[in-house]
Amino acid sequence: MTHDEPDSAAASALAVMERHLHALNGLRENDLADTLHFPHFRLVGTTLDCWPTAETYLSDFRARAGDHWARTAWQTIDVQRESANKVHLVVQINRFDINDQLIANFDSLWVITFKNGKWAVQFRSSFAAS
């Protein structure tokens, strides 16, 4: 989705989130990287992680999610604030194992920005386990 399309910034951000989830659950690394701006940042507790490039992002996710992770779902997504080039989303995230049992549930703030000609995730602050 480009910045010039008639949809709102919030609609663009929500479309990024949908693409992100499908790419993550499909383990499609290139598609997942396309939903992120790099460098990409994640704050958990007081630890700030940074991925300068896409190369290690998916392998790092698998390490964070654990061996039992099979898929992720957004339980809720609420638009908190939007401008022409930035959207803040509060997301409640569920992670499931191969038996579709809930293995993690946490809140996260996602910042979706329009830069370099595309909408993508720039930063998130998560209440996930470290």
Could you describe each region identified by the protein language model?
Residues 36-37, 93-95, 125-126:
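Short beta-strand segments enriched in hydrophobic/aromatic residues
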Residues 29-81:
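A solvent-exposed, acidic/Ser-Thr-rich amphipathic alpha-helical stretch
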Residues 1-38:
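Short, low-complexity N-terminal intrinsically disordered segments enriched in polar/charged residues
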Residues 74-80, 92-95, 107-113:
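Hydrophobic/aromatic beta-strand elements that line small-molecule binding cavities or substrate pockets
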